[in-house]
């Protein structure tokens, strides 16, 4: 089975806009319907409904990161299988056959290269690294607990030349150096306020925003807040 329907709600974000993953997922009615929600550098972020099982397939040119927001899925591959629960993710590397499925409805974020690979700039891994040969499951909550210091983003996964990172902290974070590309900020737990020179947003669990490229921004968070960030690796 392939995706029944694919949509896009991406917009050019000159200023901060709040988006909600549960609200987006609630509007997807059919199994394997999908909506593109953001383009961060070269990485396209989509939300899809996993219910049933897709056919086996492989992508010769792109990695795919599966991040379960709600529910649970089985990700099968030529490297074995992993069961992903809410807040867990795994990367199916380029060239590795795989498929995803779930008996019950699950909301999943899918991250992969959104531009033609031949037109990409910068570093690219052209094939799966020998010796890996297994899917690695990452629990974002556990990964955040392993970060020793507050306000320090730590990389937990890579997709092409971009990194997915987690951090925790309470209070005001240091002002971030402007990024040459836009970046994705997601609230896993707690509440975060994002400020730029143009706007301010309050984000709650399941909310995300895109910080425009070159924008100076600052975060402030409440107790027990965990954030997820995706940006191009510097």
Question: Where on the chain are the PLM-derived regions?
Answer:
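A short, N-terminal "cap"/entry segment at the start of jelly-roll beta-barrel domains
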Residues: 2-46, 118-166
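Short beta-strand-initiation
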Residues: 32-33, 51, 61, 93-95, ...
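A cytosolic small-molecule/anion-sensing beta-strand core signal
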Residues: 41, 69-70, 85-86, 104, ...
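Structural motif
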Residues: 44, 53, 72-74, 81, ...
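Short, conserved beta-strand element in jelly-roll/cupin
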Residues: 49-51, 58-77, 111, 168-170, ...
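Short acidic-glycine-tyrosine-enriched beta hairpin
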Residues: 78-95, 197-214
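Ligand-binding loop in jelly-roll beta-barrel domains
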Residues: 94-123, 204-205, 213-234
């Amino acid at each position: 089975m392939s995706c029944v329907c694919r949509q896009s709600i991406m917009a050019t974000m000159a200023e901060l806009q709040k988006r909600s993953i549960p609200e987006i997922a609630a509007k997807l009615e059919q199994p394997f319907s999908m909506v593109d929600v953001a383009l961060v550098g070269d990485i396209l972020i989509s939300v899809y409904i996993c219910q049933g099982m897709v056919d086996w397939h492989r992508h010769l040119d792109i990695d795919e990161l599966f991040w379960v927001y709600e529910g649970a899925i089985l990700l099968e591959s030529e490297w074995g299988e992993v069961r992903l629960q809410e807040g867990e993710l795994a990367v199916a590397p380029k060239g590795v056959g795989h498929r995803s499925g779930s008996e019950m409805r699950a909301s999943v974020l899918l991250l992969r290269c959104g531009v033609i690979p031949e037109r990409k700039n910068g570093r690219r891994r052209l094939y799966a690294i020998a010796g890996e040969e297994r899917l690695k499951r990452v629990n974002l909550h556990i990964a955040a607990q392993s970060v020793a210091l507050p306000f320090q983003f730590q990389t937990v996964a890579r997709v092409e030349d971009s990194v997915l990172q987690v951090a925790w902290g309470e209070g005001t974070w240091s002002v971030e150096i402007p990024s040459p590309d836009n970046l994705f900020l997601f609230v896993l737990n707690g509440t975060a306020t994002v400020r730029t020179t143009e706007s301010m947003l309050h984000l709650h669990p399941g909310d995300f925003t895109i910080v425009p490229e070159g924008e100076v921004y600052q975060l402030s968070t409440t107790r027990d807040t965990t954030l997820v960030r995706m940006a191009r690796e510097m």
